[in-house]
């Protein structure tokens, strides 16, 4: 039996939503082991002087806990 956990992260990009997603997943996998999936919970843009200056995504990252860490949920 495996147990998964979900954590929410926020990522930004000056290029696009796709770049914000890629950057967020890349950063999450540097410190979270066993990442299995991610879904975009929210998307936002920041506008200055009538132009988009930043894309932001909130991602829900799902990862499977190591056997030794499953007690952490108790």
Question: What are the residue ranges of the model-derived segments?
Answer:
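Residue-identity detector for glutamine
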Residues: 22, 43-44, 56, 70
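Short, well-ordered alpha-helical segments
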Residues: 2-36
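Noncatalytic linker/hinge segments flanking ATPase motor cores
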Residues: 21-24, 47-52
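C-terminal structural segments of small proteins and small subunits
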Residues: 51-74
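Flexible glycine-/small-residue-rich
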Residues: 11-13, 42, 59, 63-65
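Short, conserved loop-to-beta-strand elements that form functional interface hotspots
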Residues: 38-47
């Amino acid at each position: 039996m495996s147990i998964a956990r979900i954590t929410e992260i926020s990522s930004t990009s000056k290029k696009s939503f796709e770049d914000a997603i890629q950057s967020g997943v890349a950063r999450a996998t540097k410190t979270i082991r066993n990442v299995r999936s991610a879904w975009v919970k929210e998307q936002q843009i920041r506008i200055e002087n009538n132009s988009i200056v930043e894309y932001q995504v909130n991602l829900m990252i799902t990862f499977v806990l190591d056997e030794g860490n499953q007690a952490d949920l108790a």
